[in-house]
Amino acid sequence: MVNPNISHLVDSFPSKVASDRVSPGMDLRKITTPILIHLLRHDMRFPTLFLIRCKLTVGRLKRRIDPRFPRELIDIAALPLWVYINLKNKLGQRRAFEVMRIAILTGGLAQWNFQYGAAEKERTFKNLCDAEIAVNKTGFTKWNTLEVVDRSEHRFEIRITRCLYHELTVSLGLPELTPVICQVDNAAFNSYLPDKVVFNRGGPNHRIADGKKECNFIWEVVG
């Protein structure tokens, strides 16, 4: 059983939830903490204590982060990154990555739906495009630089020319985590209006995380 007193310890990285989208009293970290504890139950005797220790020592990582990064971004990202770093030291990179990938994808998809108001607004192509632009202005992707390339009734394309999430992970020697965040986008966008709107990036390796200068985001109405 998960101790409810520690359910606030771990959140997915990076969190993409606008606070005004989240229901009062809803702590989305309650999604990822039980997942981590469950996944780690055979890797260590006391996974709950491991997470508490990470919570109490996360200041060590925060002091290492370049102050050029926004304080809000640091506050959001530091603990999940610190959990991952400690898992790598304890379990090795491969196991740590797979554990964090499940937590990030599960929590991230739930958070995406809150951020984009999926339960509050009708699911239409127009609303999806509007939400993407709005999230980039006021949501937790507001630190990225977005340019609209094309928008019509059947196609929407943007490019991200700067991703601070990737810059942060690279600065800490953890670039492998950025593609996991991209996987949240893949799952979320393609499940918003399945079989009606398809999301792609114009082909493989079209991301800043792949060494490109920009990330391509393309939505097309197909049904």
Positions of predicted regions on the chain:
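N-terminal accessory segment detector
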Residues: M1-H154, L164, T169-I181, V197-K212, ...
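Surface loops and adjacent helix of pleckstrin homology
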Residues: T161
